[in-house]
Amino acid sequence: PVSYYMDLNYTLIIDPKLDFDGSVYYIAYYKELEGLEGVGSTKELALKDLKQVKKDWFRLSLKIGAVIPEPQTKEELNEHSD
């Protein structure tokens, strides 16, 4: 079920970006879920957007039988950082 995946602790990254007019906005994404992004004028709004995108993507992935990656463990993250 979607709730199982929503409760997993994916590696969250939130990066500030500069818009063409010089204003700051934020892009939020999970390291393990390539292609999913949330965007907002604040970190909180970017995260809120990302959570909705993630939920929709999980629903669709489960419906079509796609593989959903699970979060990396701390050990796996350390192995890939060398």
Regions found by a protein language model. Name each.
Residues 1-13, 44, 48-82:
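Short, charged, surface-exposed hinge/linker loops at domain edges
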Residues 34-45:
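A short, exposed loop/beta-hairpin motif centered on an aromatic-Gly-Thr core
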